[in-house]
Amino acid sequence: MVKVQKENSSDESQNSTFLLLSVISIFTAIRITLLLTSQLSLHGDEAQYWSWSQDLNWGYFTKPPLIAWVIHVTTLLFGNAEWAVRLSSPILHAGTSLACALIAKEIFGKKVYLWTGIIFLTLPAVSFSSFLISTDVPLLFFWSIALYAMLQILKTRHLSWAILLGIALGLGLLSKYAMGYFLICSLLACALIQKHRWFLKSYHVLISILIALVIISPNIFWNFYSGWATVTHLGDNINLKGNLFNLGNAASFLAEQAGVFGPILFGVLIASVIKLLRSKSTDAEKWLLCYILPIVMIVTLQAFLSRANANWAAVAYVGATAL
């Protein structure tokens, strides 16, 4: 009887995996097909990223370099058509969707991971950005890889996952400096959850940070020799020189998150977070919340003090889809 139950469980898991991969493949194929037939010209940022891809460097005025490298690869293979410039977006989103599913499977089991992958794939912001090229796309991909690697480190303590975490952190930072939130969230998660505190004093964290620093160091040197151009631009974006009390901007940012995540899902997320904060949540749920709430709170504060774009908290929704 036990053997039959195990076989049935294995069959269900295989069926769910097959269905998830099928859905991801179908959505990705449809999105690529729509890109191929689209007449949409490159908008301002996309055109700028494409121009960077023609002159590869370790950094640029407004962004780190990875977006230019990605475009360089796709246009080298397929030419400089608009669809080729944007081709990496649906492909990377497919990878992020799979990583989100694996995160949910590790935390909550086999029953939810199928829907987690599908939910991420069909989020309004993900659907929209699949037809554009932006720095958020590779950022979300490497964030999801880093989150899964972190989960595996805490579970297995294997060195290989620390190496993967360092690579994901480094490439994420080369995508967009918002990857730095991951360090804040991880520090908070490990400090709050007693059984994870060992990580903060382990060689795993040193290895991960060292690898990330090696990967990001050329961009740091580029910034140094370029008068900290990108850092200055980030400071201009933060813009704390004006009115520091903008309740309307904070409210507007929070309202825009319903458009990013979807109004129904955003409502469900708020209800879930309130429920977890009011009741006794598990360590796994607390851990996941640490990769959601701090980001939304930091960017909401930024909106209150100055302004914030709707996508600035995008990485929070990797964990949110699993929650």
Residue ranges and their predicted role:
Residues 56, 260-263, 286-291, 295, ...:
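Hydrophobic/aromatic-rich transmembrane helices and adjacent perimembrane loops
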